[in-house]
Every structure is written in structure tokens, then in C-alpha cells.
Regions:
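Structural signature of tandem alpha-helical TPR/SEL1-like repeats
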Residues: 1-5, 27-39, 61-73, 95-107, ...
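Alpha-helical segment of the N-proximal tetratricopeptide repeat
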Residues: 1-8, 15, 19-26, 56
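Helix-start (N-cap) detector for alpha-helical repeat units in TPR-like alpha-solenoids
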Residues: 14-15, 48-49, 82-83, 116-117, ...
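Position-specific recognition of the canonical hydrophobic site in helix A of tetratricopeptide repeat
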Residues: 18, 25, 52-55, 59, ...
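Alpha-helical adaptor scaffolds
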Residues: 56, 83-99, 103-133, 137-139
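Terminal, low-structured helical/coil segments at or just beyond the last alpha-helical repeat
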Residues: 161-193
């Protein structure tokens, strides 16, 4: 509410709009966040944070063409943007352009081979391509690099479940829960173990 109050005095204050939009995102009010990010971009068409977050909202809405426009604008401004490139790889995956997604992720892994998140992202694409063995190799590497990355255990647990390796799946789901994933989120998977 204090952000809204401040905007009464400076309705186009970009930092205030960005802060309020971030709070809206954290509280699941993406429609309001979207409005604020649009207002920021009306004032500053090159605002990288607003482009990135609006593209993310477009992905949530499944408005992939609009997301692509924002990611491309962001990457024109900052071709090395980690979040922009990872977002574009995610977009390619959502559009089932798996090769394009892998190309982006492979380049990023070459540049930063110690980034566990990139291995998890690539493993997810490989899983969708039905290359579970490659995905498991990437997940092993991700866990080696960062043993507290819950997403790696979640994805590996789901792959194990698909492969009918229920004991391994259960162990990974339990590890993900110990790392902060709510039990309710994994209730269905655990019942299948």
C-alpha cells in the first residue's frame, strides 16, 4: 500500500513501479504486476527487468509470441543476459522447439559449466525429448555441483517414477521435501511409489 501511496505523488516513478510489481509477483497477483511492468516500459522501453518479467508473465499466460518479442528485445539490449537466455530457452521448450532450447542451454553450459541450474534446465528438455538417460546424466552433474537444488531431485524422481524405479523416486522426492518442497506438492507422486 505504501507503494500505491507513493505513486499518487509520482505516478510514473519507475523504481516504485518495479518494486510494487515484484511484490505483486511474489503474492501471485500477476495481472497487477503485468500492468506495472507495462507502465515501466511505457516510460523506459529499454528497462531490462520489466522486459524480463513481462516476458515471464506472457509465458505464464501462454502468450508465446509476446514473450518472444520481449525476450528478443532484452537480448538485443544485453546479449549475455543470463535470465534472458534462460527464459528464451524455456520459451523454446514450451513451444516444443527442443533443438533450439538445447542450443541455447548448451552454449550457456559451455560458458558457465559450474551452474547446476543449467544442467537441470537441459535435463528437463531432454526428458521431454524422451532422452531420459541423458537427462539423468545432467541431473547427476547438477546434484554434484549443488546438492541442495530441489528441482534436480524433483525431476530425477519423476524420471525414476516413469522408469518404475519406485524406491529411487521415493528417495528423491523425500530429499526434495527436506530441501523445502511442500509435501502436498508431491503427495500424488509419493502415493505412486
Amino acid at each position: 500500500e505504501s507503494y500505491s501511496f507513493a505513486l499518487n505523488f509520482a505516478p510514473l516513478a519507475v523504481p516504485i513501479l518495479l518494486d510494487r510489481a515484484a511484490i505483486y509477483m511474489e503474492t501471485g497477483r500477476t495481472d497487477r504486476a503485468y500492468t506495472d511492468y507495462c507502465r515501466v516500459l511505457d516510460e523506459d522501453k529499454q528497462n531490462k527487468e520489466a522486459l524480463l518479467m513481462r516476458a515471464y508473465i506472457y509465458i505464464l499466460r501462454r502468450d508465446y509470441p509476446a514473450a518472444r518479442i520481449d525476450y528478443n528485445r532484452l537480448l538485443e539490449l544485453d546479449p549475455q543476459s543470463y535470465s534472458g537466455r534462460l527464459g528464451l530457452a524455456t520459451l523454446e521448450q514450451k513451444e516444443e522447439k527442443f533443438r533450439e532450447s538445447l542450443d541455447i542451454l548448451n552454449k550457456m553450459i559451455v560458458e558457465t559449466p559450474e551452474d547446476a541450474t543449467l544442467y537441470v534446465a537441459r535435463a528437463d528438455v531432454e526428458r521431454e525429448m524422451k532422452h531420459e538417460d541423458l537427462a539423468l546424466v545432467d541431473l547427476e552433474e547438477a546434484i554434484r555441483l549443488n546438492a541442495s537444488l530441489a528441482d534436480a531431485y524433483l525431476l530425477r524422481g519423476n524420471i525414476y517414477l516413469m522408469q518404475k524405479k519406485k524406491a529411487l523416486a521415493k528417495a528423491d522426492f523425500e530429499k526434495a521435501i527436506s530441501l523445502g518442497v511442500p509435501l502436498a506438492d508431491l503427495h500424488e507422486q509419493l502415493q505412486q511409489c
